């Protein structure tokens, strides 16, 4: 089973994990949340993400879901992926940015897949979960 770590700005990661607990009735096995508070030293953030990755690792890989590309949570997670075996985590790591609830639900539901397949399904789930609701054509407005 692929481990999943949610890394996001405080309190997004915990809120996402709370939603998963609500949807599944329990906190899903091998899923952890790491909230990154403002002004935390990036070394401290990295250490917490690494500990969470160790906690979910079964040898099948770790998928890290982050909220915003280029922000501290994504940068910290990307460092873990870039270090590879040098991090001490003896498993592949994949980082995805743009976390949303459909992405998380897809990940949890398909954790039996391999890491790369799970990452692909997560991206599909996240993209498919972004929809425009309501009328297909914008309502005409009159400007005066």
Each predicted region: which residue ranges?
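N-terminal loops that bind phosphate or other acidic moieties
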Residues: 1-144
């Amino acid at each position: 089973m692929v481990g999943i770590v949610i890394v996001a700005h405080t309190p997004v990661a915990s809120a996402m994990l709370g939603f998963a607990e609500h949807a599944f009735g329990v906190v899903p096995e091998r899923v952890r949340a790491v909230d990154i508070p403002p002004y935390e030293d990036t070394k401290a953030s990295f250490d917490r993400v690494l500990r969470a990755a160790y906690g979910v690792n079964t040898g099948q890989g770790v998928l890290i879901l982050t909220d915003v590309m280029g922000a501290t949570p994504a940068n910290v997670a990307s460092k873990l992926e870039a270090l590879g075996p040098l991090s001490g985590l003896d498993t592949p790591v994949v980082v995805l940015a743009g976390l949303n609830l459909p992405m998380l639900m897809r990940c949890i539901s398909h954790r039996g897949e391999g890491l790369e397949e799970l990452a692909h399904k997560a991206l599909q789930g996240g993209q498919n979960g972004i929809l425009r609701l309501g009328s297909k054509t914008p309502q005409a407005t009159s400007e005066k």
